[in-house]
């Protein structure tokens, strides 16, 4: 085998369709679009959700609920994450700066996954009962903001 003799597998390469290049090609004149009608015209095709004049599905179904603009987006942080930060005081801004809370998160809860061996003071952050016990056992504390 030599580089100049290598060929692709039979049937793996398919030629592109060249439409509108004469009747002998089989795709000339109407270019595979048929005669007349909306689909044959340039730019002529229905929009997404259009069902040919029938009442579309998105209008047949009732509206449900609403999106609250004041919803609390609560993120989860583990004890392992707090150990990785390795700072004496941690609040929401610190968690966001270290990538443990996303942009839309406006509250965080600590869950007990892993271990915490350093004393950490959490400001304005809630924790589960088990996580709170682990934080206090390591010499840390939770401070609630008023």
UniProtKB/Swiss-Prot annotation:
GO cellular component terms listed in the entry, alphabetical order: cytosolic large ribosomal subunit
Positions of region (Disordered): 1-51
A GO BP entry: translation
Entry keyword set: Ribonucleoprotein, Ribosomal protein, RNA-binding, rRNA-binding
Signal peptide: none
GO molecular function: rRNA binding; structural constituent of ribosome
Domain of life: Bacteria
KW Metal-binding (keyword) present: no
Gene3D superfamilies assigned to the protein according to its UniProt record, in alphabetical order: 3.100.10.10
Compositional bias of kind Gly residues: 21-31
Coiled-coil features, chain-numbered ranges: none
Pfam families, A to Z: Ribosomal_L27A
UniProt KW Ribonucleoprotein keyword: yes
Description of how the protein assembles with itself and partners: Part of the 50S ribosomal subunit.
Job of this protein: Binds to the 23S rRNA.
Similarity comment text for this entry: Belongs to the universal ribosomal protein uL15 family.
Protein name: Large ribosomal subunit protein uL15
Lineage, uppermost ranks: Bacteria, Pseudomonadati, Pseudomonadota, Betaproteobacteria, Burkholderiales
Gene: rplO
